[in-house]
C-alpha cells in the first residue's frame, strides 16, 4: 500500500498566499514562507505553491520566492503556474524547487521531452 501523505496547496498571487472559492472573493492570508513553515511544523509531508495568476497575466515566475522557500522550509515542495518553457522549469528547479507542476499539454510535451532523458 502506498504511504498516505499530507500535501497542503497554497495559492499565490502577487507574492502572497491567498484563499478564495472558485477564485472569487480572494483574500490575502499571509506570507507563503511563514505559512509553509507552519504547515511543515504541523507535519505536512510536502507543499505545493501555485501562482494562480502567472499564466493569465503572462508574467514571469516568482523565482525569488522559490529561493526564500528553499532556504526556510525543510520538506519537498512543488511550484506551479506560468511554466511555459524549458527555461522556466530549469530556473525554478535551480532556485530550489523539488518539483514543478505544469497544466497545459503544450508545456508538458515541451518540458517532458527535454527532461525525459534524465529519468
Language-model features: locations:
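Conserved N-terminal beta1-alpha1 strand-loop-helix module at the mouth
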Residues: 1-75, 83-87
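Glycine-enriched alpha-helix->loop->beta-strand junction motifs that scaffold or abut catalytic
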Residues: 43, 73-75, 91-100, 119
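Broad structural signal for hydrophobic residues in well-ordered alpha-helices, predominantly aliphatic
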Residues: 69, 116-119
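Conserved phosphate/oxyanion-binding catalytic-loop motifs
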Residues: 79
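Glycine-rich phosphate-binding active-site loops on the catalytic face of alpha/beta enzymes
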Residues: 83, 91-115
